[in-house]
């Protein structure tokens, strides 16, 4: 395993533990005497005015639209690297996790629709349980230390990256509001400029980020979700230049600590603070939260394991070396941790609707993700080899 992937896994695992702490603090504040302080923090108005450009949003939306664009920039960089040189490079490497990820997105969505397909409003949340929180999942896996085979970590990483790519496509196709053609036209010009810079071998990361900032503003104004700008910029930054430098790798290396230790925990803190005031048992067991929780805890492992097993049995893909189906099943349960990505989709799906829908969807996400984390960890402990003890040689 390359040093890049090792460092990635270490930072994701540590970041996952910080995520848990941030979410717990948010829940405590939202349900204590500090609720007002918590809400006031999220409502802080932040404005940027440059000439005729005026963007005014509360801090919560700057986190969701702005900082999360940086997260998706890193996702774009990661996906490009893995597709060209990493765990997804070549058909043989990519097929198994790709098929597993497809099953892990289809089954949860279908299960959610079994619960909520008849309701025109809650039906919009069908993609909520389709997401996997890679940082959280790797954080739980890290608790088992060196008992986890490298191949299993890489499988989870590859599966989650493909899952992220699927979520990006879902956001672009299904969670886009009314579109401004003028803003989209300028955005298209910015994308064309980025592509030209890539073709010409421009190696200055700052040039891509400057054009990317223009792209982010245009996409924000267009009605398409602004986080997509981050993915596009990530794909456009060259992996290698003529002088053998890697602008993409350098930027990913620089961004990763900020994303793992600040941006994602801040997103979790801003979005996980669900007030339980007014929450009833009947509401908690209603179709919306139950559809999400069941989709995450049952749908994810059902889809990932079934598609993986069929792919191997039909000869479409090969099981990675030194990994068995018991371990695949345990990891597939762990992939039911949707958390930040699921909360992000829920905020898009129920934007402008009854606040109760957002509240109960978050509770469903927390219920499903927590159950998946506990059961997934327990299963991994059972199926992984015992920790090797050091032997003193005299």
From Swiss-Prot:
GO CC terms in record: plasma membrane
Catalytic activity reported: Na(+)(in) + 2 H(+)(out) = Na(+)(out) + 2 H(+)(in)
InterPro entries xref list: Na/H_antiporter_dom_sf (IPR023171), NhaA (IPR004670)
Keyword vocabulary terms for this entry: Antiport, Cell inner membrane, Cell membrane, Ion transport, Membrane, Sodium, Sodium transport, Transmembrane, Transmembrane helix, Transport
Single annotated GO MF: sodium:proton antiporter activity
Any GO BP annotation: regulation of pH
Keyword Transmembrane helix: yes
Domain of life: Bacteria
NCBIfam families with a match to the protein in the record: NhaA, PRK09560.1, PRK09561.1
Job of this protein: Na(+)/H(+) antiporter that extrudes sodium in exchange for external protons.
Family in the record: Belongs to the NhaA Na(+)/H(+) (TC 2.A.33) antiporter family.
Annotated protein name in UniProt: Na(+)/H(+) antiporter NhaA
């Amino acid at each position: 395993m390359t040093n890049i992937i090792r460092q990635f896994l270490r930072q994701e695992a540590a970041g996952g533990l910080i995520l848990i702490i941030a979410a717990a603090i948010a829940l405590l504040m939202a349900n204590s005497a500090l609720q007002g302080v918590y809400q006031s923090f999220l409502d802080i108005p932040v404005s940027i005015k440059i000439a005729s450009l005026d963007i005014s949003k509360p801090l919560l939306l700057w986190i969701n639209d702005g900082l999360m664009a940086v997260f998706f920039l890193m996702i774009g960089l990661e996906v490009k690297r893995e597709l060209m040189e990493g765990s997804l490079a070549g058909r043989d490497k990519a097929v198994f996790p790709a098929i597993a990820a497809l099953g892990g997105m289809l089954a949860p969505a279908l299960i959610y629709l079994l619960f909520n397909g008849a309701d025109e409003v809650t039906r919009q949340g069908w993609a909520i349980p389709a997401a996997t929180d890679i940082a959280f999942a790797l954080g739980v896996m890290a608790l088992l230390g060196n008992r986890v085979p490298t191949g299993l970590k890489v499988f989870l990483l590859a599966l989650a990256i493909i899952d992220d790519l699927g979520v990006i496509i879902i956001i672009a196709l299904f969670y886009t509001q009314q579109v401004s053609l003028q803003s989209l036209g300028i955005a298209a010009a910015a994308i064309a400029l980025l592509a030209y810079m890539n073709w010409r071998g421009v190696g200055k990361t700052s040039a891509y980020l400057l054009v990317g900032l223009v792209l982010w503003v245009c996409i924000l104004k267009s009605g398409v979700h602004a986080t997509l700008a981050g993915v596009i910029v990530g794909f456009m930054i060259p992996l290698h230049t003529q002088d053998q430098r890697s602008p993409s790798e350098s930027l990913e290396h620089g961004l990763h600590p900020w994303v793992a230790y600040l941006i994602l925990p801040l997103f979790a803190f801003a979005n996980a603070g669900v007030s339980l005031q007014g929450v009833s048992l009947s509401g908690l067991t209603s179709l919306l939260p139950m559809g999400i929780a069941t989709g995450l805890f049952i749908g994810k492992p059902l889809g990932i394991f079934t598609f993986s097993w069929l792919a191997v049995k039909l000869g479409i893909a090969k099981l990675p070396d030194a990994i068995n189906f018991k371990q695949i099943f345990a990891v597939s349960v762990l992939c039911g941790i949707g958390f930040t990505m699921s909360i992000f989709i829920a905020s898009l799906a129920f934007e402008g609707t009854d606040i109760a829908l957002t509240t109960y969807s978050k509770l469903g996400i927390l219920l499903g993700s927590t159950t998946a984390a506990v059961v997934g960890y327990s299963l991994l402990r059972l199926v992984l080899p015992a920790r090797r003890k050091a032997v003193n040689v005299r």
